[in-house]
């Protein structure tokens, strides 16, 4: 135990990160996050793949993986020749044997092959050949040093006394919340926040608002956040071909676009705008630019024809969709909007019908609102059960730089 703990004390002051096959469509982003130091206890580390799959990694494998990632990162970009890989593996084994001197290098290489195989399988949605443990974030929380995601509200709802969004969504959870109307930080100030997030070992940041594309420096901020898994939440209105190209060049990992309905009138009514066509074009432009796209739909009585919306999105080339109930905050907490919420039975049926369509048509659907649909019903549909991660797996930074438990 002494050697392991000495290694942890010296080497696990920050997470390690690398990308396998960075120029390939099947690239795998890995953030290995060590736990809080525990002198007399073995605690697993956490590997986060592409910002969403969380895998517990036992102590010895975490040490092996740490050394392998550090050696990989000395190589740089480009195709790796065989002799370079051999040198990386040789150095990895030599460093790990300082902690485990009695372990045969061949055993270390076999373990490393197993680890990388599991990560490849999980990242690509395949069943791993070995059983991996389950990670309950609530149980693991006491060993975490920081949340796994920080939502950066880079754009406020009001600016200089004027509305600062290109839509007026009737269910907007940010509208009317005091912190959403704070003054915005400048470019350099947000870059400092990114540095602090990295130092705190937070692997993922989401650029949100308000409407983050209202900022002229958004692509610059995303580019400055390349070390993280980066996501963008937007209404899609400003996603022109040129803008999407700039997002791709900034190496944005994922864009979530809010789309209420394939019915033009319903979508425009719920967004309080006349931008249905621009939003559809934004989805198409993001896909054409090679961005990873998911389309989110907050469900209510007006747009419960969700299956038709999924069919429409399928025709655009969208393969991943998410849906939710109405978040009871901001505008959505007003009496008129509360009356538009679907009952548990109604939203369950809407989701069930759409899940069946998606399963038959090569689409993936996730439901993201905890407590709206019973766990048994979600499992019966083959969906993951959502949970609230506020102040646990995620937190948020307001437009003025304050840290809050959740942006909604």
Cite the ranges covered by each PLM segment:
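Accessory C-terminal segments flanking Radical SAM cores
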Residues: 25-67, 82, 369-408
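Flexible, glycine- and charge-enriched loops at secondary-structure boundaries
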Residues: 105, 162, 179-190, 269-276, ...
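Eukaryotic partner-binding/assembly regions in large regulatory complexes
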Residues: 1-31
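Radical SAM enzyme [4Fe-4S]-AdoMet core and its adjacent flexible, acidic
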Residues: 7, 260, 265-404, 408
